[in-house]
């Protein structure tokens, strides 16, 4: 039951929706915090490929054991030749581009890695996050000193279209699972004497935006 609920959270929802138990190839851009192990536990048939600046960012041998390959690289350098083109069914970029001064170009360079019919999911703090109160664990965009650029759906949807993508959904992230869990998470932390974290309130207050798009053509506009 718990694993099913986890599949309904934003990071995993569209993997569950489009692939379920079927095999698929995933390029996880930002593969720290044991993301590989968490993903493979929910989707055993997934072929997991990860990218991160530092392979040791909250990863261990159990994570690397379930990866097909890990690419340790600085995304801002735009050097992605080592990653095969037309190889992936899904690219996941969850809270990555706000840390990159050229996040738009990173997206543009990664789109060729998708198969035709493949999907990309991008999530990031929206403009509204700059107006939310400051809080431990980040509730305001500027709470995190590594945030360098604010993106919007108005910028990303046309960008993706120019790369041969069609947007399926976009807007403010409002996860029903997290919304329902908010009061319980707050009470649980208070009882345990722990600090409340800003990310507990992201869905309630509209901190994050997302874009889900599907590849229908290559970057020249010709079906690949």
Label each PLM-derived region with a short phrase.
Residues 1-86, 90-92, 104-107, 170-172, ...:
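Conserved N-terminal segment of class I S-adenosyl-L-methionine
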């Amino acid at each position: 039951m718990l694993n099913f609920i986890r599949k309904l959270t934003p990071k995993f929802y569209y993997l569950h929706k489009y692939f379920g138990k079927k095999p698929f190839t995933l390029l996880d851009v930002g593969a720290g915090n044991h993301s590989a192990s968490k993903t493979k536990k929910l989707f055993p048939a997934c072929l997991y490929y990860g990218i991160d600046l530092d392979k040791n960012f909250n990863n261990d041998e159990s994570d690397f054991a379930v990866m097909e390959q890990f690419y340790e690289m600085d995304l801002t350098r735009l050097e992605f030749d080592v990653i095969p083109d037309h190889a992936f069914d899904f690219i996941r970029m969850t809270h990555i581009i706000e840390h990159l001064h050229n996040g738009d170009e990173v997206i543009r360079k990664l789109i060729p890695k998708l198969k035709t019919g493949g999907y990309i999911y991008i999530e990031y703090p929206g403009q509204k996050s700059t107006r939310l109160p400051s809080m431990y664990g980040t509730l305001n965009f500027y709470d995190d000193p590594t945030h360098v650029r604010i993106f919007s759906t108005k910028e990303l949807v046309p960008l993706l279209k120019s790369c041969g993508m069609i947007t399926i959904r976009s807007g403010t992230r409002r996860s029903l699972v997290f919304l329902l869990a908010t009061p319980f998470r707050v009470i649980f932390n208070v009882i345990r004497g722990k600090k409340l974290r800003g990310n507990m309130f992201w869905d309630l207050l509209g901190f994050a935006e997302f874009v889900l798009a599907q590849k229908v053509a290559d970057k020249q506009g010709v079906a690949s």
